[in-house]
Amino acid sequence: MTGTLDQLESTIAARRAADPSTSYVAALFAKGMPKIAQKLGEEAVETVIAAMAGDRRGVTGEAADLLFHLMVLLAEAGVPFADVLAELDRREGTSGLAEKAARPKG
């Protein structure tokens, strides 16, 4: 299941050093975390809007955009996707309420 996301992570890393005038990914990195975070937020809102409208096709497209921009944000933050998967694995089998209660406060 992660093969596509692994490939996307590699593509994002490769395009990071590209010319921002010819690469959307390079342009995002050139603008830094504020722009990347803004784009992630926009895609999250668009995903919610499509879901609330019952637009399955829209949800699919917006979810793809959301995952793409999340991967860009993770790269900018220096967080490998494998770390996110490891955290999900760690939480597997733990009640959501128990896991949330165990998180550090603050």
From Swiss-Prot:
<keyword id="KW-0028">Amino-acid biosynthesis</keyword>
<dbReference type="GO" id="GO:0000105">
    <property type="term" value="P:L-histidine biosynthetic process"/>
</dbReference>
<keyword id="KW-0378">Hydrolase</keyword>
<comment type="pathway">
    <text>Amino-acid biosynthesis; L-histidine biosynthesis; L-histidine from 5-phospho-alpha-D-ribose 1-diphosphate: step 2/9.</text>
</comment>
<dbReference type="InterPro" id="IPR008179">
    <property type="entry name" value="HisE"/>
</dbReference>
<dbReference type="GO" id="GO:0005737">
    <property type="term" value="C:cytoplasm"/>
</dbReference>
<dbReference type="GO" id="GO:0004636">
    <property type="term" value="F:phosphoribosyl-ATP diphosphatase activity"/>
</dbReference>
<dbReference type="InterPro" id="IPR021130">
    <property type="entry name" value="PRib-ATP_PPHydrolase-like"/>
</dbReference>
<comment type="similarity">
    <text>Belongs to the PRA-PH family.</text>
</comment>
<keyword id="KW-0547">Nucleotide-binding</keyword>
<dbReference type="GO" id="GO:0005524">
    <property type="term" value="F:ATP binding"/>
</dbReference>
<keyword id="KW-0963">Cytoplasm</keyword>
<keyword id="KW-0368">Histidine biosynthesis</keyword>
<protein>
    <recommendedName>
        <fullName>Phosphoribosyl-ATP pyrophosphatase</fullName>
        <ecNumber>3.6.1.31</ecNumber>
    </recommendedName>
</protein>
<dbReference type="Pfam" id="PF01503">
    <property type="entry name" value="PRA-PH"/>
</dbReference>
<keyword id="KW-0067">ATP-binding</keyword>
